[in-house]
């Protein structure tokens, strides 16, 4: 069920990050070096999840692994125990909650019309559903974290916190962001561009689907213009 995937990615996955934040409050703040293995594992796990996204052919699996990779950045930022790292982790959890939920919603919109989640079988939707393609583009750009979205603000805070803690981490973080941009563009091009493989008539997008996407994108845009509300 798509509703379960949306709630899982947007809310339940973030409860783990919230639990880590609460647990870190009772840890000694001066002993950041003891968390070095966890930070390295979190960043390496984010890269591996991103690489797994690149070889996925199932649309929902790709989005799910994308959520895993972003949570790796969140864990690494929380472990540093700095104000910038904590703000970046909180902001990324909220931003990615909206983004991943919107991606699952769009995946369901595609599935209802093609009855498949295989990327290569869902191509050519920009000719059939141009408004849905617009939503796909906006959501993928937010997943890539381009400015001035809140995703960009959060990743910039996390990058600054990690770099000030250990400059070497910029290599792992930069590689993770590069792969994120690669699979996000691959997902958009695979589902929207190219010749369509559908022979039957496809129903247009409904008002409820546009309303659902608006309720995902609009709050994210508004918080992006005033990020101090959550930081």
Curated annotation (Swiss-Prot):
Pfam families: Proton_antipo_M (PF00361). It comes from the Eukaryota. GO terms for biological process: ATP synthesis coupled electron transport; electron transport coupled proton transport. It is a multi-pass membrane protein. GO terms for molecular function: NADH dehydrogenase (ubiquinone) activity; ubiquinone binding. It catalyses: a ubiquinone + NADH + 5 H(+)(in) = a ubiquinol + NAD(+) + 4 H(+)(out). It is an enzyme of class 7 (translocase). It is found in: Mitochondrion membrane. Keywords: Electron transport, Membrane, Mitochondrion, NAD, Respiratory chain, Translocase, Transmembrane, Transmembrane helix, Transport, Ubiquinone. Its EC number is 7.1.1.2. GO terms for cellular component: mitochondrial membrane. The keyword Membrane applies. The keyword Mitochondrion applies. The chain crosses the membrane at residues 1-21, 34-54, 63-85, 89-111, 128-148, 156-176. Belongs to the complex I subunit 4 family. PANTHER family: NADH-UBIQUINONE OXIDOREDUCTASE CHAIN 4. Core subunit of the mitochondrial membrane respiratory chain NADH dehydrogenase (Complex I) that is believed to belong to the minimal assembly required for catalysis. Complex I functions in the transfer of electrons from NADH to the respiratory chain. The immediate electron acceptor for the enzyme is believed to be ubiquinone. This is NADH-ubiquinone oxidoreductase chain 4. The gene is MT-ND4.
